[in-house]
């Protein structure tokens, strides 16, 4: 690995130099083990500890197939899907690997007794397989996490509809929390040159998800002047939605749960902020009964920020706890987009407020290559910024996943892989200086 790292840090190594570097036989990777999938049986979700299931193992370098690339990973980050993998909820991801392994002789590589996790990376291309023309060894890249086969016509209008669509590092093996990762070449995008490795790795999954859900025509299709209600507006997902709304000329109404989180939203430029804890909103009387009076009180509060207008778009991801209120406060003809259900999957709402007011509910999941590319392009232009708050070593990934699981973080948490320290990889210092305050906005919160 030293030769690879030396070539990356030299900034003078050519593509031919990288192509000539010998690949190691093995590399360090964050894994979960198939023989431990029952280790948390009988425990509540909260009591399942990723630090017990996550391992740092030496694993063999995978075979490189057509249309693929091996990437030296300088940094990665932790998403909720890595937490789900580590606590084996809602199902063991080894089920995904087994199913993928049955697809073809090549995909059998993924069905292993260990799962290398992680759905973000920033690094350098080491090798490309047959049929890869747009990328070469030595290219500095980030990767989005959509893995598709595109052998069915269903995926050719929107690749997220490919029947064989999977999330890399969650539903496939050889993910980004490792020193080397295996990706398809159509996952690669240029690394933003004003960001360090760990900063560039952080936006990936959540930035692309927020872009599709809020901006893309496959999501809400946000336009200038729209009133956008954003739940968890300072979090890993909501913080990107807040930035997209502000950059796109919309009016974000940011819902948070503390004054500290309200301050984060203000630092991004948001003015309309609702601290749901301070204002005492309780949308459920008990576990089975919602409180429409609270919906109405919430809607009245929103209209104080919008000049009496209702919400055009709701950026939903809490799910069960908030969904009834989300449907209620949306204007006639408005849109509720949802990409998750962190408070519960079984949603309840009064359907009269949906059908009689011609509202729409849109399910949104990650992003296609074009959407991920556009989201990354905005980061590269300095229009959207990383929300990196803390960085861990590869050895401490279990602690990073634990902190995300227990919601002890803000924004995104990063993980250094091959990068020996933070702050490396910046190629455009002038652009960085223009945006340094925004880049560091979430640091050490």
From Swiss-Prot:
Binding residues for Zn(2+): 149
Q: Which GO terms describe its biological process?
A: fatty acid metabolic process
Needed co-factor(s): Zn(2+)
The entry summarizes how activity is regulated as: Inhibited by NADPH at concentrations above 200 uM, by MgCl (30%), by ZnCl(2) (55%), and by CoCl, MnCl and CaCl (100%). Also inhibited by iodoacetamide, N-ethylmaleamide, the thiol group inhibitor beta-chloromercuribenzoate, palmitoyl-CoA and myristoyl-CoA.
* Protein keywords: Metal-binding, NADP, Oxidoreductase, Zinc
Q: Which principal EC class is assigned to this enzyme?
A: oxidoreductase
Enzyme Commission code(s) on record: 1.3.1.86
| Activity-pH behavior | Optimum pH is 6.5.
Query: Self-association or partners: how does it assemble?
Result: Homodimer.
Can you name this protein? Crotonyl-CoA reductase
> Which organism was this protein described from?
Streptomyces avermitilis (strain ATCC 31267 / DSM 46492 / JCM 5070 / NBRC 14893 / NCIMB 12804 / NRRL 8165 / MA-4680)
């Amino acid at each position: 690995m030293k030769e690879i790292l030396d070539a990356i840090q030299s900034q003078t190594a050519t593509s031919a130099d990288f192509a000539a570097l010998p690949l190691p036989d093995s590399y360090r990777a964050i894994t979960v083990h198939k023989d431990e999938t029952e280790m948390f049986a009988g425990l509540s979700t909260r009591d399942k500890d990723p630090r017990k299931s996550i391992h740092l193992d030496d694993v063999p370098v995978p075979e490189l197939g057509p249309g693929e690339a091996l990437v030296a990973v300088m940094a990665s980050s932790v998403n909720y899907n890595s937490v789900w993998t580590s606590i084996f909820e809602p199902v063991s991801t080894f089920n995904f690997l087994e199913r993928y392994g049955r697809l073809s002789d090549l995909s059998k590589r993924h069905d292993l007794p260990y799962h290398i996790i992680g759905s973000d990376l920033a690094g350098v291309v080491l090798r490309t397989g047959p049929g890869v023309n747009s990328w070469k060894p030595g290219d500095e890249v980030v990767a989005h996490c959509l893995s598709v086969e595109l052998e069915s016509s269903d995926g050719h209008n929107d690749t997220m509809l490919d029947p064989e669509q999977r999330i890399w590092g969650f539903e496939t093996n050889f993910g980004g929390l490792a020193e080397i990762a295996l990706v398809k070449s159509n996952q690669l995008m240029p690394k933003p040159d004003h960001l360090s490795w760990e900063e560039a790795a952080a936006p990936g999954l959540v930035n692309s998800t927020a872009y599709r859900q809020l901006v893309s025509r496959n999501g809400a299709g946000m336009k200038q002047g729209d009133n956008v209600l954003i739940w968890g507006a300072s979090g890993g997902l909501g913080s990107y939605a807040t930035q997209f709304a502000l950059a796109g000329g919309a009016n974000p109404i940011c819902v948070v749960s503390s004054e500290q989180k309200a301050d984060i939203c203000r630092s991004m430029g948001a003015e309309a902020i609702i601290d749901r804890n301070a204002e005492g909103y309780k949308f459920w009387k008990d576990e089975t009964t919602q409180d429409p009076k609270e919906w109405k009180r919430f809607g009245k509060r929103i209209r104080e920020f919008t000049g009496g207008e209702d919400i055009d778009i709701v950026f939903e991801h809490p799910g069960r706890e908030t969904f009834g209120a989300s449907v209620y406060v949306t204007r006639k003809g408005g849109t509720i987009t949802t990409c998750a259900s962190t408070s519960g999957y079984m949603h309840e709402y009064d359907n009269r407020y949906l059908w009689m007011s011609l509202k729409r509910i849109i399910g949104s999941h990650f992003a296609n290559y074009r959407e991920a590319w556009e989201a990354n392009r905005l980061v590269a232009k300095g229009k959207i910024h990383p929300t990196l708050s803390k960085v861990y070593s590869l050895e401490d990934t279990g602690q990073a996943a634990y902190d995300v699981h227990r919601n002890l973080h803000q924004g995104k948490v990063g993980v250094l892989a091959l990068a020996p320290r933070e702050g490396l990889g910046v190629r455009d210092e002038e652009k960085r200086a223009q945006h340094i305050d925004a880049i560091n906005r979430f640091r050490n919160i």
